[in-house]
Amino acid sequence: MQVEIDAGSGFCFGVTTAISKAEEELAAGGRLYCLGDIVHNGMECERLRRLGLITINHDDLRRLRGAKVLLRAHGEPPETYALAAQNGIDIIDATCPVVLRLQKRIKLRYEQVPGDGAAGDGADRRPQIVIFGKPGHAEVLGLVGQTKGEAIVVASLADVSRLDFSRDIYLYSQTTKSLDEFHLIIDYIRAHIMPGREFRSFDTICRQVANRLPEVRAFAARHDLILFVCGRKSSNGRVLYDECRRVNANTYLIESADEIDFRWLDGVDTVGICGATSTPKWLMDRCLEAIKHYRPEGNA
């Protein structure tokens, strides 16, 4: 049986940087907190917990004083930085550069009032800032925070009809969303916006993420069985897993090697192991080793 790990799977640049910063700080000693799960993968979070990383939420952050806190790749709204400064917290900012640039673009757009900037009706003339993303996702909360909570989040094409097409619309996207669906949303808004109103779209989807879709399709198509390894909280993982299943119905989502049902291997010649941008390489390696060392009963 041939078993292959997808070379393109594994941590994206932003996650790699965040984890490296955490490991460096932990190796230097002292207590380090992380605001939210550093990555949407329970096995990797547990590995870092054993190294000493303490995961906290925003309520915990309000109670901390003089601590050292790492901000993960997803980014945070301005209020988090203000609270940290108020509480004397030392921030280690691991926000992904792609997310950081997007935050700055949205903030700049929000602060620009169309026209001559005359006082009185600026709020009424401000265009709608729309973000294609998952409501409540950490990255999306950070993006909405750049607009003091005024940005409108659309989770899918079905949500777009509730926009006010009599006002200007500026469309952005969460960096890990589907490029295909983003284009469908663009087409819908173009078809419905009223004459004389401005619509501008900004393709802010991370290319490292977007390029994974065609790559994972091709990988899934050339194997009899696909083991997709990722945490079940990963938005990016769900998109990629669904894409694998569309190409290869013999695809299974697992969080670790312990979840492999070896009956799946019956009659299989080739197995492909792949994962999300939040899946550590070591976890896929363990799945490969589990398959290599598996001996069916009677063949030991």
Regions found by a protein language model. Give the residues of each.
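The feature marks the mature, well-folded catalytic cores of soluble enzymes
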Residues: 1-300
